[in-house]
Swiss-Prot record:
Organism: Nostoc sp. (strain PCC 7120 / SAG 25.82 / UTEX 2576)
Cited PROSITE patterns: DHODEHASE_1, DHODEHASE_2
Positions annotated as active site in the UniProt record: 193
Pathway: Pyrimidine metabolism; UMP biosynthesis via de novo pathway; orotate from (S)-dihydroorotate (quinone route): step 1/1
Domain of life of the native organism: Bacteria
Keyword Chaperone appears in the UniProt entry: no
Name assigned to this protein: Dihydroorotate dehydrogenase (quinone)
Subunit structure: Monomer.
One Gene Ontology term from the biological process aspect of the record: 'de novo' pyrimidine nucleobase biosynthetic process
Co-factor binding comment: Binds 1 FMN per subunit.
Membrane-related topology note: Peripheral membrane protein
Binding site for FMN: 78-82, 102, 157, 190, 228, 256, 286, 315, 336-337
Purpose of the protein: Catalyzes the conversion of dihydroorotate to orotate with quinone as electron acceptor.
CDD domains, sorted: DHOD_2_like
């Protein structure tokens, strides 16, 4: 029996009605403690239990991409470990890679609470966090102390500081990258969060090109750089970004961030505010973005014939969800909202399901499944 799904989650969500952000903070405190006391006998015991319960190793799930070894294709999406306080523990929870951040050059408190809401009827979350984090320098100091101690690739998601005007965005991203470039395995240019005023305008080709230009000029260590896009873009805008990815030799595209659309939601009123989701600012993640993110993955694959790697994220709850994104063209996938709803067993359940899919389709490795929709 999945204790989290049938006991812990109902207790926290329905009976205690714990505030989502408070619950997240308590979770991060616990994971941070585990991550930074790993030399203690008691902590090692807990980590061993986690690894035995939550990790699944199989060579068919391994991939070598952008010069990095991924033990499995399921990663933690950005937004969960904003300051990298638990970076060493994610491998013990079964993840094949983890993306830290979003981090900004200037530390900032984010938007005022309440700013995180569950929409259980829609298997979704609505957030307007606003890139709350302690800043790139603080993350850099923390990761420098732990350098060489990670058993999975660690990505860093970079955002624009709220105090920085849009016309100075390129320098702001560059300042963060300079502090962190030797400490992350790959980097993500986040220009798609709806919760920083004007940020999504940086997805415009002229604005985005200035950011990518300065980053790649600085990128003498040749770290893989991705751009993360919104699900609400028109096809023409996505095609423009694909062109930039080729021009600036990006490692790939992450599809997608949260959506600002509200159509089709079952939730009528958000309990914490008494308002409808349509009245609340913020981005929606989870099941409502599932199909759109997969459509965009499929579009990118078709436009590039699979030449640009894609990390697929949005509405992944089950092995079938993961398989749909991989066969549409995603080399890797990331989870966040689904992990909150499904619990810590979710990663191993998805990996087990993916292995079953490989056997069903008589494939020898997960890499053979990438873009399977388009292979005869």
């Amino acid at each position: 029996m999945d204790i989290y799904k049938f006991a812990v989650r109902p207790l926290l969500f329905d009976l205690v009605k714990a505030d989502p952000e408070w619950l997240h903070q308590q979770t991060m405190r616990s994971l941070s403690w585990l991550s930074h006391t790993s030399d203690r006998t008691s902590t090692k015991w807990v980590q061993n239990i986690l690894q035995k319960s939550l990790c699944l190793e199989d060579s068919r799930l391994e991939q070598n991409l952008f010069g990095l070894r991924f033990p499995n294709p399921v990663g933690l999406a950005a937004g969960f470990d904003k300051d990298g306080v638990a970076a060493r523990i994610w491998s013990s929870l079964g993840f094949g890679f983890a993306e830290l951040g979003t981090v900004t050059f200037v530390g900032q408190p984010g938007n005022p609470p309440p700013r995180l809401f569950r929409l259980p009827l829609d298997q979704a979350a609505l957030n307007r966090m606003g890139f709350n984090n302690h800043g790139a320098a603080v993350m850099a100091a923390r990761l420098a102390d732990e350098k060489g101690q990670f058993s999975i690739p660690i990505g860093i998601n970079l955002g624009k500081s709220k105090v920085t005007p849009l016309e100075a965005a390129a320098e702001d991203y560059l300042n963060s990258f300079r502090l962190l470039k030797e400490l992350g395995d790959y980097f993500v240019v986040n220009v798609s969060s709806p919760n920083t005023p004007g940020l999504r305008s940086l997805q415009d080709a002229s604005m985005l090109s200035s950011i990518l230009d300065v980053l790649q000029k600085e990128n003498n260590s040749h770290k893989p750089i991705f751009v993360k896009i919104a699900p609400d873009l028109e096809w023409e805008a996505i095609a423009d970004i694909i062109g930039l990815a080729k021009t600036y030799q990006l490692a790939g595209i992450i599809a997608t961030n949260t959506t600002i659309r509200r159509d089709g939601l079952k939730t009528q009123v958000i309990e914490q505010t008494g308002k409808a989701p349509q009245e609340e600012a913020g981005g929606i993640s989870g099941a409502p973005v599932r199909d759109r993110s997969t459509e965009i993955i499929r579009f990118i694959w078709q436009q590039t014939q699979g030449e640009i790697p894609i990390i697929g994220v949005g509405g992944i709850f089950t092995p079938e969800d993961a398989w749909a994104k991989i066969t549409a063209g995603a080399s890797l996938i990331q989870v966040y909202t689904g992990w909150i709803y499904q619990g810590p067993m979710m990663v191993s359940q998805i990996l087990t399901g993916l292995l079953s899919k490989l056997e069903e389709h008589e494939l020898n490795s997960i890499s053979e499944a990438i873009g399977l929709e388009f292979k005869s």
